């Protein structure tokens, strides 16, 4: 069965890996003041941080259900029968919910959605490893979710921030938490 993988850009899949493997990365919407961008498509990380340093207020939004559904439908038209979708943590974003809603709107393709419960490059590395193992035949489809859980327990991500200003400006902290 032809299988494809999907994730959102917050999971930071290596661009070279993305271009050479059966994975589609759906960009997160990035808003800086009144301008809207697609993460890593219409704005680079360097440009994003430059604009924040210059005082623009950032916020992000999960990919729209319609955009996710379009990806699922395009993969189905390419003959894909199974899709594994990795979502940034449902505790941090509505992306998981959007993946589920899109799944409910399409028939004829099996979709497994995995809530990574994390964010950042370490998740991307785990996904890349899973795809390599699956593509070489060493990882059966039925074991993908368990393999992700196994890999995710092999690392911890510690995040430090220079200032909490951007977390507040992006809506991740309330005013009381910020002060």
What kind of region is each of these model predictions?
Residues 1-2, 79-82, 109:
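Short coil/turn segments at beta-strand junctions that form active-site/ligand-binding loops
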Residues 3-4, 10-31, 35, 91, ...:
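Mixed-charge interfacial surface used for oligomerization/domain docking
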Residues 36-85, 89-98, 104-105:
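Class I S-adenosyl-L-methionine
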